[in-house]
Structures are given as structure tokens and as C-alpha cells.
Amino acid sequence: FGFKVGAAPFHLAIPDAYSGTSSMVAGVLATASKAMGFVALMRLLLTIAMPATGPAFWYGALAVISVVTMTWGNLAALSSDNPKRVLAYSSVAHAGYMLAAVSAIGSGLADGPASEMIVVAVLFHLCVLVLFKMGPFMVLSAIEREGGSHRVAGLNGLASGDPLMAASMF
């Protein structure tokens, strides 16, 4: 599941996969694939691998993976000049945020209602991520069709030239 959700150290292929394909295909990879992976991972960890009492054996490792994933995703995005790679690293960082929440459930410190709220928060985050990740990929797809650049610098002037398209990047 680490590769499917984009968790470090399994995330290394994600920036190459997003930047090496069309923006619409990358948008599907960034949304549908990640959503299905997270739902399956949460189902496995919280239904099958969760003990009746006390912490789960996997929560410590998942907590460390989530911290590394958050940090790596954000730092790597800073050095990229390809918008699809920036979005890929953003997906990696968001995977870390959601993994941190899942590891909080596994710690055993959250009681029943708190665990349920964490699950709802992760699912909400996942839904928002899916909705707001498609916008930038659609904009990049439109720019590609018009023969635009594959660099962040190619987005200069987008807000003055097409404000609606620029707003869709957020």
C-alpha cells in the first residue's frame, strides 16, 4: 500500500509517473489511485489489524513513515520546476498527513468517538484532495493542448490572461 498511497520510501516513482504522462492521466493517477489506496489501507489497518485494546503493532512504524513522507514531499516540491512534479510531491505530502491521522488511531490513545472523528477527517481530507487535485491537472492539460510550457515559469501571466483558469489552479 505504500506505493499506492505515495508514502516514503515507496513514493519515488510518483513524480516520474505524473510528469511522464499527459496531465489528464496524471490527474487520474493523483486522485482515483490514491483514494482507492487509502480506503483499502484504512480498511485493512483499522478493521483487520487493530487490536481490541491498546496500541496496534503497526502504529509506530506508520508514524515514522508519515513524518518522513510529509517532510520529503514538501521539501522536494520546493526544488522542482515542473508543475506536474510539484503536484506529485504535494500528493506525497498529503499522504503523510493522512497517514499521521491513521497512526494516531493505531496508537490506542483515541477512544471510540475520537477514532471515528479521525476516520471522518481522513476521508474528508481525501475527498477534498481528490476534488482540488483535478483542477490543476485540467489547467495543465489545457495549457498542454495550447502548446504551453511544461515549466512553472510557463504559468507566468496566467492570472492576467485567463483569471478563471488561474483560479482553477487552487
Set out the residue ranges of the language-model regions:
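Alpha-helical transmembrane segments of multi-pass membrane proteins predominantly involved
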Residues: 1-170
